[in-house]
């Protein structure tokens, strides 16, 4: 069903396919369209045009065109007044020269009237300059804001429509880097600085026009140096762009480590892995540091050469001008006057000075162009499988068509050398149940991905009926399929919105009318009202009938998936937010939500990839019954390792190593006694029982069909349990990707953050000093050269004043020539000195900035990784926001030790030197001119305050948009499978709307003060000439004194204006410093002895937060000598829970553990079983001391850990989590993370652990073996392979206590047997506590604890529980394959 086009925030229309179509494109003139196409072309134009491609290659609309044109015209207009002033000042010089050098006695009143008239003209010109500047800064600020909004939306939209293979090969951290660092760089390079740059160029061109009109000879001589300016500008820009690209690559890798670490803090804490992750992070930063230094030196050489050329050209101008004035003085024919020469020298001197200020802008523009190219590469990329496209057949029905794989071969783009499917052929009959079973990594999930067309086969094809899958519209295909993935991915929305996502692309005609509401804000507004206290019925009624229909469909789907009871038990019900990746829900609860999302669309095809792996057997049985009911006329394809869920399938396909080994019904395959029969023998609980009586009793119970346990009674039991649960049963992950706007950017005490006093500037500076202290020598060198650069302007004023005075025709020709030679030489010497000072200044500050940046980032990450889970889970803290602390905030803070602080100090030095010199030379003139400086400074300070408030207010708002993008890319398979591109795009655009509107208002306010700061110097010129002329005519001072004081003060005021252009950078640095100091000021448990990087705090530096960091961090991925125990410990840990009560901070009204008491003896193998959400994983979270219980004791080896500080006890505990996490790094590094904190695992120990986990052969078969790089979250490995890698990581620790949370849920039966055998080897030497829903995993346990509603309701051996525990016995019956 077509959807009405709606204007997107980018000024474009979005069709129902999600494709953006510029709304104003057809009305644009042809010349503009051609220009746009020219600048949009890839690889056909030189890098010089990269900046113009950034401006014009993103489909700007009419408003953007108007803003660019008006801003450009106003920028050009802003540059013209200054050369006009040169003409007026030249005429004033002629008047002054006439009054002091004339042989005739003219009345002073005549000179004064002429001077006053010209001063009034200067005031008119200054008003024109202010108007032009305000217009061009405002227009270009809006251009920049609108451009980055278009880039954000286009980049996000492009990411959404790319095929999964693209995101698989996307460098980790790339998306975060693009939307945080690159967007900031682009905004800096396309806003008000563009107008200032245009004004500079306009000034330069106008100055030369005036110069040619006045004295063409001097102008022509100086014109020859213009190419040198552009050679240095663009040549330096090329190398800056080159080094920026290299730096970006290293920073992306480092950002990925930060992002994955902050997203999986439970793993970081469980293995005390913060030191190793910090060291790997530091390695990437060190790699980036040398390129950053080269970039800084290139920039300083570029800047220094511009100064050198400017000053050298002035030396040439003075020399040539002196010769021409000497000829005039000697009576030779000449049309040149002293005022004309002064005009040329003045405007070209000033133009050269202003042009030399262009270098920082060139650096900013080059960086913006480089960042734009990186974004445009993705934006322009054509997707091989575009889920938003309207191409392909949208009429075919999958309800009655046979699906067939024909000789399919496939390998993942991330590992092209590893075959996944090899000649796979089989048929999936319509309206039948086809089950696919096999070993981990055999290609089962890949088949599902091909059926969804997330990938295309390398060879062969997938057919639906007689049509190739490639001929069918992708959106229509995916809309006809309900998918439940092996690892269910939920978006950070409410439960209602997550389930309703299944309706977005539904192929059912009855759902089409719901689409506009699903894509709009209605559901989010509904859930927000419910969370604020409104009843669901009231809120639904207010939203209308369509929303009510969606809610009813959602409730029905949740009932089918056995999720409705735990949803109703939650305080906010369907409005409950699930958190980042569903972190607020247990694994079983997430799986039921994902199943509801698939069932709500009533699809003709169901793809179930381990859809019930995280569920207990009772829940699985209930859901299986519901699936059997809804799939009567549905084509169902299921992947399962629990063969009990596959045995009733119409056809079972057995796969191994990417090939189909056999297929048939359960009975047929068992009768063949082949691969499948072997799997059955391995998995059947009874045949593995150590007690024959257990199997006998179980069979007898099954024979009697246990009529007391009907589906209805089981459902009632489940409802009762669920109403008692409704709580988290997962180790909490970092908080939601969305962030409340009222939350502080970095609260340290969430419960009273509103009362937290605002940090003063002095406190921020004091807190930042330890970060800067190690680089004090470099900074001192930079400050000295900055002072030299600032004082050089005063030296220039002295030379200038004496030169102008020496050009008076009152002096003889020889005197004028010798003075011109002398002062020209002095100017050339000044050029050499300034060139050297600028290079040293840039290198010193550049190196100091990079070292400060390295130190700040490492210390920030260290502090973040040491915070407890409860801190990370507080409202207002999201992985995306915390990543920004380490990346953007650290970078902003480091600018205070880089070029920003250099410009600031040179400006201050210039100001003080100019003021002092002026008072020494002519204090009466200086005092009057100095009175204008507070006005200039006040305008700059006011702009600083405006920008600081604006920056702080909207820092979080754009972080939210970035977090949405990162979340979407992380969950791209779910978004593609359910065609949620439009929904994600709509949410993203809504997140941009508020900050965009506010930013546009801030533009008008902030740029008023910037324009005033720049323009007020012209008024100072007017006052200077008027007052100076008064003093000269009165005989108080000479022309030489006046022309020393004038440039000394006016260069100072111009420098202040330039300094205020850096106000946004200073504002960002101030806020960033406050955030980082807040972070580093948090006291940590065990601060007095903490130092995980291997260096204890010295007596001099006792604060561990600021321990000296190694410039060359250790290579954590290299093989090191180890002191890890060579064998497993001889004795396990004893564990006791005594009357433990606990509630998660995010759910204070829901008990997670309710008076839990269990006792585990050293060396025992114990198991925790029970329904999903009963509190099993919570026990592990408390055992690891991620949280402290509300009451009760947790005793490990006789020590109550709730009363102990620190977490040293974790050193001998290993955890295998329910969701297996890989970090950026090699396979060896990921497994080595499990080693104890004070040692490194050897290669032999890593391989031994992998053999125990049955993953060694898989790793060895990879081209790079153990050096294979894992992408973020290990996307290139299958679920079962990641699970075995997690087990290896735990075993390499040689723990005394091993915690297994569903550690074999994603394993095939053969791999599971290998792991069970490995665990048997370490049993009795290690205490093992396992959470499992597969009873064959734990039926040999020494003791099994039944956990229900946060309590232990029964315990005993397998045989004892089968005999007396009804729910346990029901699970055994359900999982038995003998039935």
From Swiss-Prot:
Binding site residues for ATP: 438-445, 1170-1177
Pfam families reported for this sequence: ABC_membrane (PF00664), ABC_tran (PF00005)
Induction: Expression is induced upon exposure to amphotericin B and the allylamine terbinafine. This induction requires the presence of MDR2.
Keyword Glycoprotein carried by entry: yes
Transmembrane segments: 65-85, 119-139, 193-213, 215-235, 301-321, 336-356, 781-801, 820-840, 881-901, 920-942, 1008-1028, 1032-1052
GO CC annotations on file: mitochondrial inner membrane; plasma membrane
GO molecular function, one term: ATP binding
Topology in the lipid bilayer: Multi-pass membrane protein
Stretches assigned to the ABC transporter domain: 403-682, 1135-1374
A biological process from GO: oligopeptide export from mitochondrion
Domain called ABC transmembrane type-1: residue spans: 69-367, 781-1068
InterPro entries: AAA+_ATPase, ABC1_TM_dom, ABC1_TM_sf, ABC_transporter-like_ATP-bd, ABC_transporter-like_CS, P-loop_NTPase, Type_1_exporter
Compartments where found: Cell membrane
Keywords, sorted A to Z: ATP-binding, Cell membrane, Glycoprotein, Membrane, Nucleotide-binding, Repeat, Transmembrane, Transmembrane helix, Transport
Glycosylation sites: 97, 552, 633, 989
Coiled coil: none
PROSITE patterns referenced in this protein's UniProt entry, alphabetically: ABC_TM1F, ABC_TRANSPORTER_1, ABC_TRANSPORTER_2
Region feature Disordered, mapped onto this chain: 738-758
Source organism, top-level taxon: Eukaryota
Family of this protein: Belongs to the ABC transporter superfamily. ABCB family. Multidrug resistance exporter (TC 3.A.1.201) subfamily.
Function: Pleiotropic ABC efflux transporter that may be involved in the modulation susceptibility to a wide range of unrelated cytotoxic compounds.
Name assigned to this protein: ABC multidrug transporter MDR2
UniProt gene name: MDR4
